[in-house]
Amino acid sequence: MTIVVATLYNIQQKGKTLHIMPLMPTHYIAQIRDHMDEHGLDSQAWLATFYLSKDLLHQPGYLIEYHQFEQLILAAVEECGQTNIGSSIGKRLSITSHGTLGFALLHCASLRQAIELCQRYIGIRTPLMDLTFKQDQKSFIIGIRELFNIQNIRRFFIESLCVTLQQSLSVVVGHNKLFKCLESNFPQPSY
């Protein structure tokens, strides 16, 4: 049986090629807004530039087009002047920031169960990525696979995802030294 969730994608037809881009939830944009507020930046003006408001961000099920999501992030990075804003946003996210996925993680009995839960349900939090997972004798290996071209926000997104994964999985196992190695396809940042 195939299930198609049509509300999650915006299909744009250009010539004969269909470009499918996801519609994005706004719950993490609210975290960026809070980060900007804490640093004395005008988040209302930032949102207004993209025809958004604080109230819209908190409407359940509110979605924006990927292009708008991308432009919001790029503008926030520029406005904040922080190259590490992705990891800063990741640090802001507690396990319960991830809605029902976070609450389900709280009930996992093992690291393996938590990783498998994240792998299976990450799509309810972001349509941009999925996770791969394998285990060998000494380690768990989590891979992050882009489902769409997110080149312009890749560093921000990967950093925030890795930090929030580290934090959430640490809650499950009770200690915070889980990630021993992080390999990425972009240069190592100075921070």
Language model segments and positions:
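Alpha-helical bundle regulatory/interaction domains
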Residues: 111-191
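N-terminal low-complexity or simple alpha-helical regulatory segments
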Residues: 2-142, 157
